[in-house]
């Protein structure tokens, strides 16, 4: 593996874990709202939003996994690859923040604890 700082590796792996937790939270809220109210005109929008939130987190999760693996296999990793990793961490965090806000709003609106 190209020698990445431990802080970068830890940051990427922690973000992957939080992205996975975010996917789980979005799908759990979607399931709870569906079980509580079914799929109606009133719930259709929020169910779609929660599904989209989970989907938006899959991309950065997969990208981080792929980049870390490619960097480990590349000897040495290119600076472009490393830059892509750093940008992916930033973008993944932004996606996670946006998704968390959407999930919290849906849970609040539909009284899901």
Language-model features: where?
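Leucine-rich amphipathic alpha-helices with coiled-coil/heptad-repeat character
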Residues: 33, 61-64, 68-71, 75, ...
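N-terminal leader/targeting helix
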Residues: 1-20
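Residue-identity detector for glutamine
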Residues: 16, 36, 49-51, 75, ...
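Amphipathic alpha-helical binding modules
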Residues: 78-113
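Amphipathic, heptad-repeat alpha-helices with coiled-coil/zipper character that mediate oligomerization
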Residues: 14-28, 48-69, 95-98
